[in-house]
From Swiss-Prot:
The keyword Membrane applies. InterPro entries: GPCR-associated_LMBR1 (IPR051584), LMBR1-like_membr_prot (IPR006876). Its main location: membrane. PANTHER family: G-PROTEIN COUPLED RECEPTOR-ASSOCIATED PROTEIN LMBRD2. Residues 22-32, 121-144, 202-381, 448-467, 537-688 are cytoplasmic. Residues 1-3, 54-99, 166-180, 403-426, 489-515 are extracellular. Residues 600-617, 635-644 have a biased composition (Basic and acidic residues). GO terms for biological process: adrenergic receptor signaling pathway. May associate with G-protein coupled receptors and regulate downstream signaling pathways. Belongs to the LIMR family. This is G-protein coupled receptor-associated protein LMBRD2. Glycans are attached at N76. Residues 222-254 form a coiled coil.
C-alpha cells in the first residue's frame, strides 16, 4: 500500500473538482483556458485538504521511529510521552515513502500561488475585457493589473525593508522565500477568520431551519419576490443595451472599417434580437465619411463589455427563476401532503426531467412521503446538533491552541490520544473530518458571497468566466492558511508546540516563521481569537440587520418589509402555478384529441389512398374513354371532405393551446382561412 492511497486520492479529487466545475460552469460555451485554469485551481486546493491527513499520519510514524532510536533522555523531551524503546512502531496503511511528500507539496503550493497571484488575475481582466482582438484584451488586462501587482510589491517591499533594517537577520534566499509566504498567509488568514466566523454559526443554523417547513416556504417566497425584481431589472437592462446595439448597427454600414466589430457584438446578442436587427438593417446604403456621428472603437469596446455582462445576467436570472419555481412548488406539495391520509406523496406537476428507473422503483410515493413528511425534519435536526458540536469544538480550539502545557485544544487532545496507541485510521479520520468541516465553513461562505451581482457562483452551468476565475483565485489564497491553522489546532506545527519534533512535510516547505517574530508569535496566535466575536455577531444576525438598514432587503421574521415581500412572492408563485396548470390542461386536451380522433383520420386516409389507386388503374386501362376528369373531380371532392374533417373544431377546442404548439404550426399542412384566422384567442388577458 506504499503510495497507493496517495494515488487513489489524487484521482478521486480530480473527478470531484471536475464534477463541481461542471455543475457551476458551462464546458460548451466558456473558453477552454478558463475551464482549465479554474479546474487546476480547484483541484490543487482540494488536493491539499485531502492529502494533509496522510502527511500527518506519516509524520507521526517518522516521529515514533526517531523516538525509538534516540536515547531515553531525548525521548522524554519529545512532543509526546512515548512507551519504552522496546515498543515497535507500526507503519500506517497509507504510509508515503520519504522524499515524496516534500516534492509533492512544493509543486502543489507554488503552482497554486502562481495561479492566484499572477495568472488568474490576468485571465480575469482578459475575460472581462470587451476588446475585439487578442492584443487589445492583453493591453486592457495589463493596465487593470498594474495597480493590483503594485499593491503586492508595496507590501512585500515593506516586509523586506523591515528585515533589512533589523540587524538580527542576514538576508538569504530561504528567508526571502519565507517572507513572501508569510505575507501571502497573513492576507489569507485575515480573510479566513472572517469567513470562518460566519460559517461556524450559519451552517448549523441553516440545517436547523431546514427542518421547519413553514420557514423554508416563507423564505422561498421572499427569494421569489427579490429574484423577480432582479429578473425585471436584467430584462430592462438588456433591452436598453440592445437598443444601443441596434442604433450602432444601423449607423455603421457593411463597408465601414468598424463593421467587423459590430458583427462581433451582434454574435453575442440573443437570437431573437439578432433576427430583429437583421430585418431592420439596410446593407445597400453606403456610409458617408463626412458624417461625424459614427461611434469610436473605444465606445464599441465598452458596448461589447456591457453586452457580454447583460446577456449573461439575463440568462442566469431566467434559469434561477425556473429553479426557484420548482423549489416553491415542491415545498407547497410537502405542506399539502403532510395532512394526507393515504400517506402517499402526490406531486402537483410531474418532473420535466426523466427519472432513473432504479430510483423510481425504490423511491416510491409511500417512501417519499415518509422521508419528506416524517424523517427528513428529524434528520436535519440531528445533523444541526452534530454540526453545532463541531462548531463549539473549533471555536474553543481556536481560542486555546496556543496553550501547550496543559493542552487545552480539543482537536490536539484527540490527536495525541490516538498517537499514543498508533491508531492511524482514527488519526486520519479525525484530521480529515476537522479540516473538511473547516473547509465547508469557509468554502460554503465563498459560494454564497454576492458582490453587487458582479461576482456570483450560480449552479446549473450559469456562472460566468469572471466569477469562476475569482473563485479559483480565492480558493488558492484561503487553502494554505487554512491548513496551517489546522496544524496549529493539532499542535503539529513546531511554531505552536515550541518543540524540536519533526515537522510535517507541508510545514517544512513554509519555512521557519521565526524570521518575522511579530507574525509568528503575535498575529498567527491572537488573531484567530477574533472568531468568537464574529460568531456572536452572526448568531444575533448583526450583519443582516445592518444590510437591512442600508436598504439591502434581508430575510428577517420581525420586519414589515420582509412580510410584504413574502406576500408578493406568494402571489407571484400562485400566478406561475396557474399558468403552468393551464398549459398542462391544454396539452392534456390535445393528447386526448389525438388519441380519440387520430385513428379515425388514419383509416380515412388509407381508404382514400386505396380508392385513388383503383381509380388510377381503371383510367390507365381505359385511356380511350374520357372518364379521367370525373375521376379527378371525385378525388378532389373526397380530399376536400377529408380536409374539412381534419380542420373541424372539437368540443373542447382551445385556440390558444393549438396555436402555441410548434409541431402544429410548423407541420406545413393546409390551414383554412376566413373567420377561423380572425377569431381572437381566448384567455389572452388572464395572466395580466
Amino acid at each position: 500500500m506504499s503510495g497507493a492511497a496517495l494515488g487513489l486520492e489524487i484521482v478521486f479529487v480530480f473527478f470531484l473538482a471536475l464534477f463541481l466545475l461542471h455543475r457551476y460552469g458551462d464546458f460548451k460555451k466558456q473558453h477552454r483556458l478558463v475551464i482549465i485554469a479554474t479546474l487546476l485551481a480547484w483541484y490543487l486546493c482540494f488536493l491539499i485538504v485531502f492529502i494533509l491527513p496522510l502527511d500527518v499520519s506519516t509524520t507521526i510514524y517518522n516521529r515514533c521511529k526517531l523516538a525509538v532510536n534516540s536515547s531515553p533522555a531525548e525521548s522524554n523531551s519529545s512532543f509526546v510521552t512515548l512507551a519504552p524503546s522496546k515498543q515497535q512502531c507500526f507503519k500506517p496503511w497509507s504510509y508515503i515513502p520519504n522524499g515524496i511528500m516534500p516534492i509533492f507539496w512544493r509543486v502543489v503550493y507554488w503552482t497554486s500561488q502562481f495561479l492566484t497571484w499572477i495568472l488568474l488575475p490576468f485571465m480575469q481582466s482578459y475575460a472581462r475585457s470587451g476588446g475585439f482582438s487578442i492584443t487589445g484584451k492583453i493591453k486592457t488586462a495589463l493596465i487593470e493589473n498594474a495597480i493590483y501587482y503594485g499593491t503586492y510589491l508595496l507590501i512585500f517591499g515593506a516586509f523586506l525593508i523591515y528585515v533589512a533594517v533589523n540587524p538580527k537577520f542576514n538576508l538569504q534566499w530561504n528567508q526571502l522565500q519565507t517572507i513572501g509566504i508569510a505575507a501571502a498567509n497573513t492576507w489569507g488568514l485575515f480573510l479566513l477568520v472572517l469567513l470562518l466566523g460566519y460559517g461556524l454559526v450559519e451552517i448549523p443554523r441553516s440545517h436547523w431551519n431546514g427542518a421547519k417547513r413553514g420557514y423554508l416556504l416563507m423564505k422561498t417566497y421572499f427569494k421569489a419576490a427579490k429574484l423577480m425584481t432582479e429578473k425585471a431589472d436584467a430584462e430592462e437592462n438588456l433591452e436598453d443595451i440592445m437598443e444601443e446595439v441596434r442604433k450602432v448597427s444601423e449607423s455603421i454600414k457593411y463597408n465601414h472599417p468598424l463593421r467587423k466589430c459590430v458583427d462581433t457584438i451582434l454574435k453575442k446578442c440573443p437570437t431573437e434580437y439578432q433576427e430583429r436587427m437583421g430585418r431592420n438593417m439596410d446593407d445597400y446604403e453606403d456610409f458617408d465619411e463626412r458624417q461625424n456621428s459614427y461611434p469610436s472603437e473605444k465606445s464599441l469596446v465598452k458596448l461589447h463589455k456591457q453586452v457580454i455582462y447583460s446577456v449573461q445576467r439575463h440568462r442566469r436570472t431566467q434559469v434561477q427563476w425556473q429553479i426557484l419555481l420548482e423549489q416553491a412548488f415542491y415545498l407547497e406539495d410537502v405542506a399539502k401532503n403532510e395532512t394526507s391520509a393515504t400517506r402517499q406523496f402526490v406531486h402537483t406537476f410531474q418532473s420535466q426531467e426523466p427519472e432513473n428507473k432504479i430510483i423510481q422503483y425504490f423511491y416510491t410515493p409511500t417512501v417519499e412521503w415518509y422521508w419528506e413528511c416524517l424523517l427528513r425534519p428529524w434528520f436535519y435536526r440531528v445533523l444541526a446538533v452534530v454540526l453545532a458540536a463541531f462548531s463549539v469544538i473549533v471555536v474553543w480550539s481556536e481560542c486555546t491552541f496556543f496553550s501547550t502545557r496543559p493542552v487545552l485544544s480539543l482537536v490536539a487532545v484527540f490527536i495525541q490520544l490516538a498517537e499514543k496507541t498508533y491508531n492511524y485510521i482514527y488519526i486520519e479520520m479525525a484530521c480529515f473530518l476537522t479540516i473538511f468541516f473547516l473547509s465547508i465553513c469557509v468554502y460554503s461562505t465563498v459560494f454564497r458571497i454576492r458582490v453587487f451581482n458582479y461576482y456570483y457562483l450560480a449552479s446549473h452551468h450559469q456562472t460566468d468566466a469572471y466569477s469562476l476565475l475569482f473563485s479559483g483565485m480565492l480558493f488558492c489564497r484561503l487553502t494554505p492558511p487554512l491548513c496551517l491553522n489546522f496544524l496549529g489546532l493539532t499542535h503539529m506545527d513546531a511554531t505552536i508546540s515550541h518543540t524540536d519534533a519533526q515537522p510535517t512535510a507541508y510545514t517544512s516547505i513554509m519555512g521557519s516563521m521565526k524570521v518575522l517574530s511579530f507574525i509568528a508569535d503575535g498575529f498567527y496566535i491572537y488573531y484567530p481569537m477574533l472568531v468568537v466575536i464574529l460568531c456572536i455577531a452572526t448568531y444575533f444576525s448583526l450583519g443582516t440587520r445592518c444590510l437591512n438598514l442600508l436598504g439591502f432587503q434581508q430575510f428577517m421574521g420581525d420586519s414589515e418589509m420582509t412580510s410584504d415581500l413574502i406576500d408578493e412572492g406568494k402571489e407571484l408563485i400562485r400566478r406561475e402555478k396557474g399558468r403552468r396548470q393551464r398549459q398542462e390542461e391544454g396539452e392534456n386536451r390535445r393528447r386526448e384529441w389525438k388519441e380519440r380522433y387520430g385513428n379515425r383520420e388514419d383509416s380515412t386516409r388509407n381508404r382514400v389512398v386505396h380508392t385513388e389507386q383503383k381509380e388510377s388503374s381503371f383510367s390507365e386501362t381505359n385511356t380511350n374513354r374520357p372518364l379521367s376528369k370525373y375521376t379527378r373531380t371525385n378525388g378532389r371532392t373526397e380530399r376536400d371532405r377529408i380536409e374539412l374533417l381534419q380542420d373541424a373544431e372539437p368540443l373542447d377546442f382551445n385556440a390558444d393551446s393549438i396555436n402555441d404548439d410548434p409541431l402544429e404550426s410548423d407541420s406545413g399542412r393546409y390551414q383554412p382561412g376566413g373567420r377561423y384566422l380572425s377569431m381572437s384567442r381566448s384567455r389572452i388577458f388572464e395572466d395580466v
